[in-house]
Amino acid sequence: TELSEGMKVKFYLTLALSHHAKLLILDEPTSGLDPVSRDEMNEIFRKLADKGVAILFSTHITSDLEKCADTITYIKNGEILQSSKKEDFISHYTKEIGGAPSLEDIMVHIEREEVIL
């Protein structure tokens, strides 16, 4: 039988942790997962971070950032344009955009180059 995307992610995560990895580098780890599986993975990431495992992951899913990120690094065309604590990142762009934008709203403004990085 073939593993679901969620089971594949969990399998590879378990494999890395079996070697006592202190750093996990994951490319779009929740992409293609259903909402329940995505929430389960984010919970696993939070628990691992609480235990001292550093997790670096790329994503286009802003809800993952809202749930898991301590730090957000914005990279465009291979160049780091912004890197800061999540709260500072949101605060900076909230001042620039005004109101109470969600992280997704902020990312849309950045992508449309409506704000200054």
Segments from the language model and where they lie:
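ABC ATPase "signature
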Residues: 83-84
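Conserved H-loop
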Residues: 53-61
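Helix N-cap at the start of a conserved alpha-helix in ABC-type nucleotide-binding domains
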Residues: 35-37
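A short, surface-exposed alpha-helical micro-motif characterized by mixed small hydrophobic
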Residues: 65-67
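Catalytic Walker B motif of ABC-type/P-loop ATPase nucleotide-binding domains
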Residues: 24-28
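Hydrophobic anchor residue at the start of the ABC signature
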Residues: 13
